[in-house]
């Protein structure tokens, strides 16, 4: 057999071997896909998840249905996902607390993130802003720290739930500023309501969760996380500027049950990365003050491990 025929046969064999994988990827999805969100409807996470679901539905020509299952810092939602087939038809909208913090918060956690879940795609990251109710009569972080030290343990703070990023962020603020506060956890949007009426007068939240209230003078921004000031809040200093090391991860990712076919994972990853270049989706990220994160599925594991290693000792 001459070299030309041999190379031709080898090329044919390579194509034949690749066809099953291509076919598998091209035939997904053939039915509706569920995107499970561990927060209530109307929250910032829910808004982002629905924006993504809309674009995936358009790309796949199949409905992507958002299902809200709040509670236990995502544990209920993840348990539900793990009870479904590992086929890519049930995806989980994860935050850093679900994947990196929960193993340290719950001794009997019913799942192991690195073992039971597989990364699909990173989505975005958000800075946090520390806000206060006008009823507290503080205008700067220094004002608040002085007040809290004069009233140790009297001031309460709201969060999105025990172990939520908003909870741990405030615990970090308390530790770094040398103050003590009472924690009042909420599910869904109750924390913002309690914050504005002064019942729990301070909170740390992603910018999108409080920006409308800041603009409406219903909340006072005191400091932001990150290395630089935010374009949306140029007059608000960073914790770093004020001498406090308060860095809080606020990323979101899509994960699936471990064992999901790699070809399906790769297709979903490629489609989400493509959606992040969509002008309408980028605009929606901008409305929520989110920075897109793109990369292969392995990026999810990298972020998850990085923040588990960093925050485990703190927790």
What function would you assign to each model-found segment?
Residues 30-32, 176, 262-315:
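An extracytoplasmic/periplasmic, membrane-proximal ligand-sensing/linker region
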Residues 83-89, 104-191, 202, 239, ...:
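Hinge/capping helix and adjacent helix->loop/strand transition within the periplasmic-binding protein
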Residues 50, 54, 58, 79, ...:
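Solvent-exposed, polar/charged alpha-helical surfaces in well-ordered, non-transmembrane soluble domains
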Residues 107-114, 228-246:
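Small-residue (glycine/proline)-centered packing/hinge motifs flanked by hydrophobic/aromatic residues
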Residues 25-115, 154, 162, 177-204, ...:
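N-terminal (or domain-start) structured segment
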Residues 98-108, 171-176, 202-234, 312:
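A ligand-binding cleft/hinge motif common to bilobed small-molecule-binding domains
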Residues 1-11, 17-21:
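Twin-arginine (Tat) signal peptide motif
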């Amino acid at each position: 057999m001459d070299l030309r025929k041999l190379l031709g046969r080898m090329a044919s064999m390579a194509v034949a071997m690749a066809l099953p994988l291509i076919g598998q990827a091209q035939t997904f999805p053939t039915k509706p896909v569920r995107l499970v969100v561990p927060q209530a409807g109307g929250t910032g996470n829910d808004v982002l998840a629905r924006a993504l679901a809309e674009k995936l539905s358009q790309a796949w020509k199949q409905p992507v249905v958002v299902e809200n299952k709040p509670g236990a810092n995502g544990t209920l939602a993840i348990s539900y996902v793990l009870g479904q087939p590992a086929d890519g038809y049930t995806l989980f909208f994860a935050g850093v607390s679900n994947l990196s913090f929960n193993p340290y918060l719950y001794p009997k956690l019913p799942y192991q993130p690195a073992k039971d879940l597989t990364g699909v795609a990173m989505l975005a990251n958000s800075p946090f802003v520390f806000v206060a109710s006008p009823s507290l009569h503080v205008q700067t972080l220094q004002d608040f720290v002085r007040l809290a030290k004069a009233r140790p343990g009297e001031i309460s703070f709201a969060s999105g739930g025990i172990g939520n990023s908003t909870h741990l962020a405030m615990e970090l603020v308390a530790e770094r500023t040398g103050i003590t506060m009472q924690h009042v956890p909420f599910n869904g949007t109750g924390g913002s309501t309690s914050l504005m009426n002064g019942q729990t007068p301070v909170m740390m939240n992603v910018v999108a969760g409080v920006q409308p209230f800041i603009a409406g003078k219903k909340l006072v921004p005191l400091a932001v996380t990150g290395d630089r000031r935010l374009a949306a809040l140029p007059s608000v200093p960073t914790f770093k500027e004020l001498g406090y090391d308060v860095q809080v991860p606020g990323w979101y990712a899509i994960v699936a049950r471990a064992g999901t076919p790699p070809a399906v994972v790769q297709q979903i990853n490629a489609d989400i990365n493509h959606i992040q270049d969509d002008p309408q989706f980028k605009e929606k990220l901008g409305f929520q003050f989110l920075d897109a994160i793109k990369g292969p599925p392995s990026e999810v594991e990298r972020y998850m491990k990085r923040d588990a290693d960093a925050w485990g000792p703190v927790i």
